[in-house]
Amino acid sequence: VYFLELWHGPTCAFKDYALQLMPRLLVEAKKNLGRTEKTLILVATSGDTGKAALDGYHDIPGVEIAVFYPTGGTSEIQRLQMATQEGANVAVYAVRGNFDDAQTGVKKVFGDTAIAAELAKRNIRLSSANSINWGRLVPQIVYYFAAYAQLLKAGRITFGDEVDFCVPTGNFGDILAGYYAKRMGLPVGKLVCASNENNVLTDFLTTGTYTAKREFFKTTSPSMDILVSSNLERLLYHVTGSDAEAGGLGKSLG
């Protein structure tokens, strides 16, 4: 058994690996496309994503970021990390409810054409730093390959040996990155979905039935305190091969 250390970023969250790179990719993409509008990043968080996103996007030119977290739904350290973030372009808001409520609210904003039209008048375009944004998943694929390379270098495996990965999972993004690494050719054996008391994903993968309407538990691992996992819809797409079917199934998760 080996542990992949992903806490060496500036906020000690594994999400630093994506959220330190993602803002720079955004700036370069806007430059290449000749886009001059301001980008407003909306983030729902149960703790570590919020701080990692704030740290990555603070004082990035042409970008503002607003983070929404559930009152009492993060650790006190995470709340203080977010509340004390420096930067002229950052804002943090507490919302009543849990992470799923915050995430649902952010998704509704993205789907509201009236809001999009009003923002367009103000030369503002919405984006997200959550894993609903494909740009969050791409950097996470890399460290599966890096982990495999480290095992090769240490002589623990030989090239072509399959390696199993056990991934603590809430919104299904990190483990999905492992799935994409496997599809890209990395010799991955099993991807083990590890859950806490909010084990909706474990139940789904075990029984084939997704039941989000259940008791929500606040645990000591708030980043996994999620009942509606956004990235599961992406897996459903690959299983069904249909945008429409996956979209319909995704909407039914809540």
Regions found by a protein language model. Name each.
Residues 1-254:
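PLP-dependent amino-acid enzyme catalytic core
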